[in-house]
């Protein structure tokens, strides 16, 4: 007589992962407006550099990192971050501009642009849909993790509104 393995697998799966027909965990909603903090930990890889005359250059860099919310709130926490950045230096004067996509554990994301002072929310998905606001930041430079790489810790103070 053949015995089916399915009942045993279902029991083992239930014990390991919870109820087969269990209640899905509720996704934490973002309040309609607020202020909080998050810190991003970045590794930076300059992709292209063009050196020009008279202390001038342009650099395109890719930033990869994660965020943590030190206030213990569930939003803007454990997000993976992917950014592109341009750094322009003209006769020693530097400015920068970039854009990022931050995605949380639920798959919800924010999109931002940034300059040397703050990130600016241009929208999002899921709990971040309709987000506007800004996140001024400071930069702590870490030792380089390897040749041609940089690393930073960037604390942000974010103020947002859902529209």
Regions found by a protein language model. Give the residues of each.
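Bacterial N-terminal signal peptides that target proteins for export
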Residues: 1-9
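Well-ordered, non-transmembrane segments within structured domains
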Residues: 2-3, 15, 104, 120
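Bacterial N-terminal signal peptides
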Residues: 8-18
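Beta-strand-enriched cores of mature, soluble protein domains
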Residues: 23-163
């Amino acid at each position: 007589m053949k015995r089916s393995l399915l009942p045993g697998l279902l029991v083992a799966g239930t014990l390991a992962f919870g109820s087969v027909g269990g209640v899905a965990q509720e996704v934490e909603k973002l309040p309609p407006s607020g202020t909080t903090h998050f810190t991003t930990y970045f590794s930076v890889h300059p992709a292209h550099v063009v050196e020009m005359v008279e202390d001038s250059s342009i650099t395109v860099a890719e930033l990869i990192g994660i965020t943590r919310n030190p206030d213990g709130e569930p939003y803007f926490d454990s997000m993976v971050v992917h950014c592109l950045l341009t750094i322009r230096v003209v006769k020693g004067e530097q400015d920068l501009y970039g854009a990022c996509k931050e995605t949380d554990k639920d798959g919800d994301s924010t999109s931002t642009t940034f300059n040397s002072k703050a990130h600016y929310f241009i929208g999002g998905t899921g709990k971040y849909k309709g987000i506007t606001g800004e996140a001024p930041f400071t930069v702590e430079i870490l030792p380089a993790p390897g040749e041609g790489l940089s690393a930073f810790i960037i604390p942000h103070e974010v103020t947002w509104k859902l529209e």
